[in-house]
Design a protein with these regions (language model features):
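PLP-dependent aminotransferase class I/II
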Residues: 5-177
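Glycine-rich phosphate-binding loop of ATP-grasp-fold ATP-dependent ligases
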Residues: 1-2
Length: 177
């Protein structure tokens, strides 16, 4: 399911999801399109989930706030919030300070020992083996995406987590510094 601010955005998204074919008597494409479609079952599940979306966002924001409060003062940064945005906090990510002496692998190993699942931040496309021979352009010597990958950790943030669960994750992380 895709939510759009305007009907024009919705029409453009539908165009891209249906191969971006132009209104011509032949297959003509002025944009790269895709063949994305959602099954009726998936659409029905998505519609049903819309009823609980405000609650889920509230839960995710509470989890993020708890992490932020509990991890305050450590050599790491939580995701920032722009004044012009209301983040849904779908994913909670921390960035370790470059000189903190702890790597994402260290942190994930310690969390794993405590039976807590965490993940590396997504590996950038330019570092994927399949794209090794493809050109990559960056405005800086060290691309932002590479830096985020090198320092980022995705923390558990399922809406079924209790605040005690979040506190336990934080306790393990605090024990590393």
């Amino acid at each position: 399911m895709l939510l759009c601010r305007t009907e024009e955005e919705a029409k453009h998204a539908l165009k891209l999801a249906t191969q971006a074919r132009e209104n011509a008597p032949w297959y003509q494409h002025e944009e790269i399109g895709y063949n994305y479609r959602m099954s009726n079952i998936s659409a029905g599940i998505g519609r049903g989930q819309m009823k609980v979306l405000p609650l889920r966002v509230e839960q995710k924001q509470a989890i993020f706030a708890r992490y932020s409060e509990n991890l305050k003062g450590l050599p790491l940064t939580m995701q920032p919030k722009l004044d012009c945005a209301k983040p849904n906090r779908w994913l909670t990510v921390l960035l370790l300070d470059a000189d903190c002496g702890v790597t994402p692998a260290d942190m994930l190993g310690r969390l794993n020992e405590a039976n807590i699942e965490g993940r590396h931040l997504w590996k950038p496309m330019n570092l994927q083996p399949i794209f090794a021979d493809c050109p990559f352009v960056s405005v800086s010597e060290k691309p932002v995406c590479d830096d985020l990958f090198a320092r980022g950790v995705c923390l558990p943030s399922d809406t079924k987590m209790s605040m005690d669960d979040v506190d336990r994750v934080c306790e393990v992380i605090r024990g590393m510094f």
